[in-house]
């Protein structure tokens, strides 16, 4: 495989491109290499060879080092600690952080050769949520050091105005449902769940991370477009009762590898029949972005750049609170509602 380069008898150096940046992963055993290959295949993290785009820092120092079957270092006593999403605990002294995830350990900013180091709790099942969570945290930390900042959001582009639209929210907020409805209505799409933000001069761009969409049975049942194209039984089962599918095989609309967001919807399920949309001030929009990006404060080595990107995103966009009602289970209603805020 072209992404793998031998470093030592048991170590492989793997080079990837993501959101126009290069990241090097050092897998220190064969199982770790297989994990990276299989999990990265589900994201827009593409194997490549060494290129002229690689800086001296990137080529000489891996962004991630991962291994199994090796005892992790002891977490220093007395460090500050806090709970993180997914059931883990982060320990930090302000410069170095350790994330404990069910016995697996992710070290960020440890003064060794890799920016992020991973010790898995044995050879976990490759498709297990536990292992995916470990690799996700490691990748997000490494990408922050490449000035790419993760955001839980769907992303689409209005076919008439060309505006990039982000549908932001945690799991269970309705962002995947609305993203699917808009893609079914002919809006170009990037992702329904996780994206990366980057600064290109004064402009902020959004890039998709996860390749597949994931929906609930309720969303599928309410979407005539999806039901005419596929059976729920043929979609791969996911945690929390969701099913995933490849959007390029489902929608007639076009996939885009990035967009410039100009409209932000912070989605939450309201349970009412009709949705409500409330305009947010720039300060309220920034506060909500920070709540959705806790590592903009937790990871001090990247906090200044992270907050600067969020601030630039606020300046180029308009933010809204979306109290999602049952009416968004209808494709036409969803498209008309969002279009009323993205078109003059």
What positions do the PLM features span?
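Active-site flanking residues adjacent to catalytic metal/cofactor-binding acidic residues
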Residues: 192
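Post-Walker A alpha-helix
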Residues: 178-179
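Conserved lysine of the Walker
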Residues: 175
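A noncatalytic interaction/capping subdomain that flanks phosphate/NTP-handling catalytic cores
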Residues: 1-171, 184-185, 195-344
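Residue-level detector of anion-binding/catalytic polar loops
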Residues: 188
